[in-house]
Swiss-Prot record:
GO biological process, any: positive regulation of myeloid cell differentiation
Subunit structure: Monomer.
Processing and modification events after translation: O-glycosylated.
Residues with attached carbohydrate: 153
Function: Granulocyte/macrophage colony-stimulating factors are cytokines that act in hematopoiesis by controlling the production, differentiation, and function of 2 related white cell populations of the blood, the granulocytes and the monocytes-macrophages. This CSF induces granulocytes.
InterPro entries, A to Z: 4_helix_cytokine-like_core, GCSF/MGF, IL-6/GCSF/MGF, IL6/GCSF/MGF_CS
Signal sequence extent: 1-20
Organism: Felis catus
Family of the protein in this entry: Belongs to the IL-6 superfamily.
Molecular-function annotations in GO: cytokine activity; granulocyte colony-stimulating factor receptor binding; growth factor activity
Name of the featured protein: Granulocyte colony-stimulating factor
S-S bonds: 56-62, 84-94
Keyword Nucleotide-binding applies: no
Primary localization: secreted
Length: 194
């Protein structure tokens, strides 16, 4: 009896380890999808950098770290990517978090509408590219049966009551987006490895 119990415990422990083990690079995602995602990350990064540079040049908001407390007061959320970190890289969780994060940034950028006339085209381009990226990920998740039964919903977005808050929010959102994209890029590159 004791031996059977030990065997059962060993088997269940092995099962739990297998379940928790992050997926390796041999994923079921097509290389064309992964390469397109990497291209989209670079495009969104370039758009985000352009927004940051324009906010810095036009409004002297060049250091997002100086605005962190204001970001907390405004309630600017950050998208989690724990399933995409190198310690816990999991394909399904990572794709879902990528999609949810892009969805969050779509909402944050919409909340920044009216930031300033000179920044509107840059903001619009960034929104379009994020939307395209989110759609691409969602379609792939549906194609391989990974899409959640219920798509993500938009949470409460910050309300910017002044032009300064909107511009400072833009600086923080662009900075947070860049950090999000760096993790996303590393995860996607990992999935492209044979």
């Amino acid at each position: 009896k004791l031996m059977a119990l030990q065997l059962l415990l060993w088997h269940s422990a092995l099962w739990m380890v297998q379940e928790a083990t992050p997926l390796g690079p041999t994923s079921s995602l097509p290389q064309s999808f992964l390469l397109k995602c990497l291209e989209q990350v670079r495009k969104v990064q370039a758009d985000g950098t352009a927004l940051q540079e324009r906010l810095c040049a036009a409004h002297k908001l060049c250091h997002p770290e100086e605005l962190v407390l204001l970001g907390h007061a405004l309630g600017i959320p950050q998208a989690p990517l724990s399933s995409c970190s190198s310690q816990a890289l999991q394909l399904t969780g990572c794709l879902r978090q990528l999609h949810s994060g892009l969805f969050l940034y779509q909402g944050l950028l919409q909340a920044l509408a009216g930031i300033s006339p000179e920044l509107a085209p840059t903001l619009d381009m960034l929104q379009l590219d994020i939307t395209d990226f989110a759609i691409n990920i969602w379609q792939q998740m549906e194609d391989v049966g990974m899409a959640p039964a219920v798509p993500p919903t938009q949470g409460t977005m910050p309300t910017f009551t002044s032009a300064f808050q909107r511009r400072a929010g833009g600086t923080l959102v662009a900075s947070n987006l860049q950090s999000f994209l760096e993790v996303a890029y590393r995860a996607l590159r990992h999935f492209t490895k044979p």
